[in-house]
Design a protein with these regions (language model features):
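N-terminal binding-site loop/beta-alpha segment at the start of enzyme catalytic domains
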Residues: 1-83
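A short acidic, helix-capping loop that chelates divalent metal ions and anchors anionic groups
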Residues: 17-20, 92-97
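Glycine/proline-rich, positively charged
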Residues: 26-34, 100-119
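A broad, low-specificity signal for short, low-complexity segments enriched in glycine/proline
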Residues: 44-46, 95-98
């Protein structure tokens, strides 16, 4: 069984959507907030983290495309040994538009759990 030795994990909230906790920190991401560029930046960070033995990755649907970015990175690996944590109960609504009025919606109902976890 794979053992998680490193106590440090990597959360992808700031890399999975163009406007989140990364607003005002564009110097580390750059001005290009397109999905392709953000995916590329996310993959660069994941490459670095994996080389440093980070094996826990935190994603969520409310983190925009973080789940897709991580899964596309995992598919590129020859071998992946790690853990992925995700969450339910929040829905990302901004559709990659930083100017959107409402970016997320919280719904902790049983029907929403079924929708997100067991479609």
């Amino acid at each position: 069984m794979f053992k998680l030795d490193n106590k440090l994990g990597l959360g992808l909230a700031a890399l999975g959507r163009p406007g989140y906790i990364n607003l005002g920190h564009h110097q580390s991401i750059g001005d290009d907030k397109s999905k392709d560029n953000m995916r590329s930046k996310c993959h660069e960070v994941l490459d670095f983290a994996y080389k440093k033995d980070i094996r826990y990755f935190d994603v969520a649907r409310v983190y925009g495309e973080s789940e897709e970015f991580l899964s596309s990175w995992i598919r590129k690996q020859n071998q992946f040994a790690g853990f992925v944590g995700s969450k339910w109960g929040y829905e990302y609504l901004a559709e990659w538009n930083v100017e959107t009025e409402q970016h997320e919606r919280k719904d902790h109902s049983h029907p929403f759990l079924k929708k997100q976890c067991c479609p």
